[in-house]
Design a protein with these regions (language model features):
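Asp-box/WD-like beta-propeller blade repeats and closely related beta-sheet repeat scaffolds
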Residues: 122, 126, 131, 136-138, ...
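Beta-rich catalytic cores
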Residues: 84-87, 106, 121, 128-131, ...
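Beta-propeller domain segments
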Residues: 28-73, 181, 198-201, 215-220, ...
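A short loop-to-beta-strand structural motif that recurs across blades of beta-propeller domains
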Residues: 109-112, 149-151, 211-213, 262, ...
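Surface loop/turn motifs at the tips and blade-to-blade linkers of beta-strand repeat domains
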Residues: 80-85, 124-128, 169-176, 224-228, ...
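Short loop/turn segments immediately following the C-termini of beta-strands
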Residues: 104-105, 147-149, 155, 197-199, ...
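Conserved beta-propeller blade signature
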Residues: 98-102, 141-144, 191-195, 243-247, ...
Length: 406
């Protein structure tokens, strides 16, 4: 065989090989960025059969709300307090009685709800915000936290029809969407407490994340208070001890029944609550738990249910409810979003004894029917009259729970 013939055959083979590669390249699926809610999701058939992400909430007409389905202990009554509040999430009451309501993905709004002649009037006081879940009210000012920053609206109740330009308080938040929306609260020390969740389902978070921080009300002197926190969307301070208690949402995609979400009790600054090494105080992580021992981290005060999704919580400081509820925690469980069996979507009452031991009882139930959510509680708030408001972002509504006796 002559040399030219050999080279012709080699050249032909190379052309064929490159053509085949081009075909495979053309047929190869394009790589798409994983949505934040699916980060860490296994690619197995079992995981793919889990429930899809719920559709975004839409407001439900007042006469269609599931208030008749709500079940409460004897003597308690539930009623619709406000409706038509798209994506209703966090709640805070102003000095003059205005209830401020935050929202998340769909609305991006802050609402002001006023009681006029027995009816609730809803106004939008801020719009087109980036996941403004975190709100707090203090001395006439409304603080609003997004994943990126914290702003303040001064003298807001006197200017609901013409809200003032927000004042920047702190603009150095990382801006992450995964676990980036906030729940904020001013502690008994007069400082603003702000969480920065883990920017992932499961990872070794940077030093700037997976913590609860506190700062002065002008955004200065930021310091870490809690470490090893994955994603808290609700916390409060004990009325007697002043100590911080917080809910923490544990990792997804390990199993339907593990890990179990936590209620944690902070007794000193700098405590580490386990993430990402230990979950639920008893389970080392299959990936990050090697060489770790759950005994080295603060154990949860209470386990709240697998993927129950604890969100807003408050210690009860009102006078309307029976004495057993004094200083109890009311905690909203949003319910699992990626579990085949729906449950929670309720409000639980948590009782704490003098030694810090906690036990949980059902309080407001009835929002799961035929494995579907009828509503999903997002926050709770004690009103000045002692009644309890419960926001429902699934229906865009707020319920009022009162007690009239047996």
């Amino acid at each position: 065989m002559s040399a030219p013939t050999v080279w012709r055959r080699v050249f032909s083979a190379m052309v064929a090989l490159l053509s085949t590669a081009a075909v495979f390249a053309a047929d190869a699926p394009k790589t798409e960025e994983v949505p934040f809610w699916a980060i860490g999701m296994p690619k197995s058939d079992v995981a793919s059969k889990l429930a899809p992400v719920p559709s975004f909430p839409i407001p439900t007409a007042a006469d269609k709300l599931p208030v008749s389905k709500l079940k409460l202990p004897p003597g308690f009554k539930a009623e619709v307090w406000a409706s038509g509040i798209l994506d209703a999430r966090g709640m805070r009451q102003g000095d003059q009685g205005t209830v401020f309501v935050s929202s998340l993905f769909v609305a991006g709004k802050i609402y002001a709800v006023q009681d006029k002649d027995g009816k609730r009037v809803v106004k939008t006081i801020a719009d087109k915000l980036f996941l403004p879940n975190g709100i707090e009210f203090h001395k006439g000012s409304l603080f609003v936290a997004t994943p990126k920053d914290i702003t303040r609206y001064d003298n807001i109740e006197a200017n609901l029809d013409n809200p003032p330009k927000p004042v920047m308080v702190y603009d150095k938040l990382p801006g992450d969407v995964p676990h980036g929306w906030k729940f904020i609260k001013i502690g008994p020390d007069g400082k603003l407490y702000v969480p920065i969740g883990a920017p992932c389902n499961l990872c070794l978070p940077p030093d700037t994340h997976a913590q609860i921080f506190r700062m002065n009300l002008d955004g200065t002197n930021v310091e870490s208070v809690v470490k090893g926190m994955r994603n808290t969307v609700g916390f409060d301070f004990h009325p007697k001890t002043g100590e911080l208690w917080f809910g923490d949402n544990q990792r997804d995609w390990l199993s339907e029944d593990m890990p179990i979400d936590e209620l944690n009790h902070v007794t000193k600054t700098g405590q580490h609550f386990g993430f990402p090494f230990c979950h639920s105080g008893m389970m080392t992580d299959p990936e990050f738990g090697w060489g770790k021992d759950c005994k080295d981290y603060v154990k949860p005060a209470l386990l709240l249910g697998a993927h129950a999704a604890p969100v807003g919580m408050r210690f009860y400081t009102g006078k309307m409810f029976p004495a057993k509820y004094e200083n109890a925690i009311f905690l909203a469980r949003h319910g699992p979003w990626n579990r085949t069996k729906k449950y929670a979507a309720d409000v639980v009452a948590i009782f704490i004894d003098d030694k810090g031991n906690a036990k949980m009882e059902p309080f407001m139930t009835g929002l799961v029917e035929k494995n579907e959510y009828l509503g999903r509680p997002a926050d709770v708030m004690v009103m000045k009259d002692g009644s309890l408001l419960v926001s429902d972002d699934h229906n865009g509504a707020i319920y009022r729970i009162s007690y009239a006796g047996k």
